[in-house]
Amino acid sequence: MKFQFSSPSKIFLFSSVILILIFIGIKFELLEDTNSNRNDKFNNIINRFINYNIDDSIYKNKQQQQQFSNKIYSNEKKILLKNKIIDTTIKPSININNNNNNNNKLNNNNNNNNNNNNNNNNNNNNNNNNNNNNYYNSIEYYSSFVSRLLKSNDDDGIYYDDYQSKYKKNHYIVQFKDRINDETREQLKEFLIGTDITILKEQPFKSHIVHYIPHDSFLVFMTKEQSVLLSSKEWISWIGEHEPSNKIHLNYHEKSIGYPVYIILSGSTNSLIQRWENTLNSILTSYNSKVKLTLINQKKLKSIVYCNDESPSSSSSSSCSLIGSEKIVYKWISEQSESNYIERSEKLQTANRLSPTVIFGTKDKLVNNDRIDIPLRGKGQILSIADTGLDGSHCFFSDSKYPIPFNQVNENHRKVVTYITYHDNEDYVNGHGTHVCGSAAGTPEDSSWAISSFSGLATDAKIAFYDLSSGSSEPTPPEDYSQMYKPLYDAGARVHGDSWGSVSLQGYYGGYSDDAGGIDAFLYEYPEFSILRAAGNNELFASLLAQATAKNAITVGAEQTAHVNYVSDALEYYDFSDNANFQRPCLFDKKYCNYTTAKCCSEVSNVKGLQLCCPASIKQNASDSFTTQPQFYNENNMGSFSSKGPTHDGRLKPDIVAPGEYITSARSNGENSTDQCGDGSLPNANGLMSISGTSMATPLATAATTILRQYLVDGYFPTGESVEENKLLPTGSLLKALMINNAQLLNGTYFWSASSTNPSNAIFEQINGANLIQGWGALRMNNWLYVKSSNPTPPSRWIGIGGLGKNQKATEWKEDSLSSGLNKSYCFTYKPSSSSSGSGGGGGTPRIVATLVWTDPPSYSGAKFNLVNNLDLLLLNSDDDSIITIGNSGGSLQPAGKVAQPDTLNNVEGIIINPTKAMNYKFTIAGTNVPIGPQKFSFVFHGENGQFDWADSCPQCVDGVQFPCLITNGIGIQSCGSDLLWTKCIVQSCNEGYNYNSLKNTCDKFLSYNYIIIIVAGGTMVLIILLLMWIKYQEYKESKRDSFRRFDDGTGIFVRPKDKDAKVTPPDLYNLVSPFIIELTIATACSLVATAASILQPFYIGNIVNNIPTTKSIGEFKSDFIIIFILAFIEFLFTNVGSWISGIVNEKMVMRLQNKVFRALIAQDMGFFQRNNSALLMNVLIVDTPMLRSALTGILLSIATGVCKLVGSLVFIFTISWKLSLAFFAAVPILGLVTQIQSQFTKRLTRQLLFHNSKASQHGTESLTNMHVVTNYCKQEKEMVKYSDQLMNVFITARKLIITNTFAGTGKWLLIESLTFVILYFSAYLVIQKQFTVGLMISFSLYIGYVVDASSSLFGVYVSYIQCLASATRVFMILRSAPRKRTTLEEEEADRLAGLSGGGGGGGDNGDDKKDKQNIENGKDVLPSNIITPIDNVENSNGKQDDPNNNNNNIGNLDYSEQLDGVSTVADSTVGLTKRELKKQKEKEQKEYFKQTGISVAETPTFLPSSYTELTECRGEIEFKNVSFRYPTRPDVQVLHNINMKFEAGKCYGLVGPSGSGKSTTLELISKFYPLHGETGGKIYMDGIDIAKIRPNNLRSFVTNVHQHPFLFDATIGENIGYAIDNPTQEDIIEAAKLAYAHEFINDLPKKYDTQIGEAGNLSGGQKKRIAVARAICAKRKIMLLDEITAELDPESEEAITQSIKVLTQGHTVVMVAHKVAAVRDCDKIFVLEKGYLVEEGTHDELMANKGKYYRMFSEDKDDTPLQNNNNNKNNNNNNNNNEPSSSSTPPNDQPTPPPQEQQEQKNDQPPPPPPQEQQEQQEQQQQQQQEQQQQQQQQQQQQQQQQQQQQQQQQQQQQQQQQQNDQPPNDYDQVPPPPPLPSESPSPPTGNNDGQPLVQMDEENDEER
């Protein structure tokens, strides 16, 4: 029966859940509204922190220091956009008035704040008013929030109209009062998430932060309602709408008209874009133009405006005004709330034999292009390039084994791992992409070719290529650059080069475009990726390509190459026709306007001016210039064409320069697939060409970066050898920092023009070490890329990488990170060099170069400045922390005598100094402003011409100094430790709305309701789930040890079969509660909710106490009191619901469990009830079962509530003070030890208590049941004394249990009280020391109480579990011993293969299942020794012939001499023992006594066969064949010996013999009350079918057994008579009573048949016997077994019943046991038994004539009649003994069988209970004497028996021969005994043939066997 809720209950629970969810939601909103208050104290802390780091000793006076501080940490409230600078101190914030009086007050207060910043009192008043107004605004918002949730669907139309404008999302600029840090950013995010309501279908996207905008502002996409609520926050200073004019960045002029325009969105859908396009096209109808909108991704849209008669790809038309159309379109789009930035797409354009010698050279000399000077060439690295195409047939890229892998990855290709065909799969003639790839990594497959001298730089690296153009067109990359970079990244590339870009056509030179933002975004998401971009070839300042302005990319400019290149390769492979200029000759004379280069060259001798258009002349002039002016053409000069910086916001670009002039590399031959290299000889004009440009410099820098990455990844740094532990995975920022740090400013001349001078490059240094022309200088890798194998002398440069100092492993390196206000320092030492050689030594000027690089988040393209996170690099003297210099200072930007200006623009900062004396230096990186953090960074520095090393320590402070420190949402303090390092920042106070979290030492919202629910409920459920998983795992392990499956008998409770002595395990207990797991889960959930609600109450109580000193009115606590009340109500509600459900579960469980136990008892066979007392069994049913139920359900709920309360309280106490919490955990081991000791005593005493209770109950029941005997013998006083003794045992045991629990509880109480005192004392000390608040102390104390209570509950669970095991022991003994049926034949086979002994449990697997199975499949008869066949009568492994289906087998070591009270008797004899030994033995017995349960069951349970023969009708024929039997309680006494009898259908048979001869046992065997044991037990057949194969209930439906003692129920007489059949009629009952001659005395009773047995007084024995006979007659069974039914009847009744029996024999088989001859005189046959032997059989007359035992029993003169020799009697079945002779089973042959011993006789022929120990010993001695006598007699009889056997065999042979001759069966069934079986065979029962017919057929006439 499953647990079900009624309809009111469902409504009640559903309403409660809704109430809780609403409360949680409102609480979440309220907590979100309670934000940190950034007050003046917080700002003061920042200033003090800053002033400390910038020490007084830095500058001469305070004025300089203040100027510097103000410059760095300026809090100027201006929003810097490209189109506009917004001064938020002047421009008002958004209007949050909305006709609300309270909001008007808020605006007035805000104005007051702006106008009265110097008046502190007014500010405080205004802040208070603001807080009140914020409260009312919040209430108004949440009221509308709830009303919207409850609004019906019918109001959707009105709702949409009312709220469309209010909830339409738009872009707002939100400025913070203070610097943005991680916490304030997360606050804003949480606010947007918590207040976001998506109502409009066209705007399904969420509110979110779009971009950072300087200063201290975010561009936010949200609703107007959110902006109004956000403006009331204390931490917000200004909010304004993002005006449409600030979104547009377009110039409308002829050059740019018609080019695509990109619209950056904050969210979009296809339907939204379609709606835009339809609207715009309807507007443009009058302008004869259209617009095409294409969605690139969800945040980028491409727009093209075109005329109606042209396609979208056209640029202009005279038939329409595109300028006017574009202005209309983009003005309209800018007014749409989803757009945030609009910019024009720009026109894309593309922008080596000696180049490697330049890059890997030094400032003084070049190196050779070989493996000695350049040993590393990028092996194991993959670089990627996106360009116009790649000629795969060129020898630099072709592979003789593998083709080019197009759109797939194949790392087996020697050069190209993938070729992504975005446009096509080839390059055009003289293609740009082929040349670029050749410079980067191209090399022929045969390195011996001469052309290999022009190989690229990273010849061992492989290429991942992305094709950007089709044919000879300019490159066209995807609009979303991540679609280009991501496939290359996935192919394994980590360094990428782009030699192309776009040129702005609208005047924003060096502007930060959306393409640049896309590059920054990809690098920010994939920090290990590096992108190098060409600066451009526009030669002017601020002429960088748009993509080159990306902050995180490495922008590459072009320097000149080695001078030898100009006089050799350039003249050979450069096409000078590209330089032909026809404009100037045309201006001179119009006739030259149409000249060709050939015409120019033909007339150049006459007109020198034509040299300008003659390539040959141009080449000659160049050659002359190269030769005569080498100072203008060498590697120390910049390329004049290289684009220069800065960017639009003043950032320094390019970053580095590389050779880019006259670079000779691979030439493409277009579609021709022929290898243009030919035989690889030189010169090779088909395979090589020379080009100039930054496009040529970029692949060389890309290759150099790839080699640098190989250097780090392979572990060459810093030893110059590949070392495994030195392998480092670099980030892109680290590679960039290393490239820049080791770059070198070119110091050559710069070629302006022929008329100008050649100034030094030094005048262009805007900062120290860098300028706008060459950035940080040219790559010179040899200065530090040291490889020991090629150069054993270490370089003169010492290099340090931040985070890789002393004792730091390269394999564990990762970037450090900073948030706002934090810093990181690196210290090193410098000493002047004592020699000119050695590591770190040199003869030049000492020099220190440091570089800081970080990957900055992408910027908003419309911002005026594009740096988001600002870090600053400072160099300090570590001895006194005085600042020496700051990053990016010096140069022309810092005039002499002025204070160094901090860099707020670049994400690259450098410092270059020349140390003059030995000193400890400290580089400090400060997180000046990190709005999107934490910001990771890479720091690299090197020293040259001196001795450098990491410092042993890096001091950060002065010893003993304390200083306030910045913490999130609060204020802390830190001290300078003895190691001169700042200690951890300790929280001093938290801002409003935050609480101290001692676990993280921070101020968090960690203690909010939402987190508590998650931690407490979630954690508890996880623990419970883990517990259940552990139980199921244990159950799984148990199932692997046996082959049993758990079974259900209809009660819903499952029990796994085990041995009787097996321990009760948690899986066993879980099986009892599993049917109620749903109800218990609901009750547990209710308990969790109630416990969670109770846990929160101390927190709010503590808040009230904390706020009392600063509170003026009790009304301010209203919200806290309401919350406490709601929590208390929730606790009350769910506690009662949980108790109600658990109570119902308790009652249901005890009902089912008792039903289960009762079923197990009812299913037991008779042997079980002979061994166990019924009163004891009832005690288990009534006492143990409810105790087990209570413990089980109580344990589960206690675990749930205890864990819930413990986890939740621990969360609070740890967040309040983890130190105080340790005091509790110090007490846990003591509590656990006490509990463990208590549980051990409790387990033992509980078992004793249950046992003594059972004994007392048993004694009381027996005394009351046998009251006649007690009264008759006057033993009342004796029984009272015995019962008192039993109760005294109960009392003594209970007293011990009480004492144990009392002492344990007292110990726990003392420990808890001591713990509470210590905690209270220490917390009071902390309060006095101002380290703790009173409210926290009260909350902590309350939570400690919760923790202690929960701990005690959980420890009590363990004690309850131990008690549960004690009560479960006897219950499971009964449940496991219940007979049960196997469910499938497969299980029987599994049991057989597992080697189950006699069908019982236990494993007998020898691990050879495979062999066993093979034996079976091969049909072998011999099975392994451990395999027990399930067929009946097979000898068990214990040597005894036990029935596998019998619960009473003598299996294993079960001691059947145990007393019923469970006390094991010691087998050793007590004869000859001293008193001391007797005492010890008694103590030993006493110990064994308490180990017992009082219940005796078989070692293994009974397994019934999986299938039975079902009888639908019965003839009533019964046959005994070789039946022998022993009672399970007396296995040493054989009751029946080899009995052979046959009862034919429809006849009456009598069984007579002395008491104890086995008559009643025979009837019980027919009823299958006891199963036969093994092969020696013989067989009993009913209608030719072995009764072992018949289901017991099916068999008994045809058999009725009237016992010699009538058993009547406490019911009416009629109910007792009709008990055997269902729904008996009154006529059936009366008829049966008449036949039993009971009708007359029943009618004499007052109520006749309705008389209760108890109300009828004491019925006589005869009356009870007649009622029992009537019940048997009423059953109308085919076979009637009557046991002494006439024993207590008067002669008249006896005669009547005898006549009735004659009537019953008509159609029935009747077997009667009687001691009176009158009862059996008329039987068809009488069987005479004596001492378990069948001694005679025949009719009354025949037996009297034989004058045997029957005659002596019933004749008047017994002594005069001699006893016939039974061995010569043909009816004695013992003459034909089919079993082996046994001295104990064969009576003497020459004398009558001696009568049975009196002490073994039991009245009514029942097996006696075990005698007392002394009687048993006497009996054993007598039996031993008898056995000795029998052995002597046996020796005398052996010869005679052998002779008799020989005679019998001869007679049998003669009879068989005679039978064969006559072909007729014998006349008498019993005349011819069956032949003895072979030694290896067993007697086989009659079985059926394949057709289901009996093999033994009965002749209907003669009723004889064929």
From Swiss-Prot:
Residues annotated as signal peptide: 1-31
Recorded topology in the membrane: Multi-pass membrane protein
UniProt KW keywords: ATP-binding, Glycoprotein, Hydrolase, Membrane, Nucleotide-binding, Protease, Serine protease, Signal, Transmembrane, Transmembrane helix, Transport
Active-site feature positions: 387 (charge relay system), 432 (charge relay system), 695 (charge relay system)
DNA repair listed as a keyword: no
Start and end residues of each Peptidase S8 domain: 356-763
Amino acid composition bias (Basic and acidic residues), ranges on this chain: 1407-1420
Disruption of the gene: reported phenotype: Null mutations in either tagB or tagC lead to a cell autonomous defect in prestalk differentiation and a 5-fold reduction in the expression of the prestalk gene ecmA. Disruption of regA in a tagB null or in a tagC null background results in higher levels of sporulation.
Region (Disordered): 96-134, 1385-1455, 1757-1906
Protein name, per record: Serine protease/ABC transporter B family protein tagB
Top-level taxonomy: Eukaryota, Amoebozoa, Evosea, Eumycetozoa, Dictyostelia
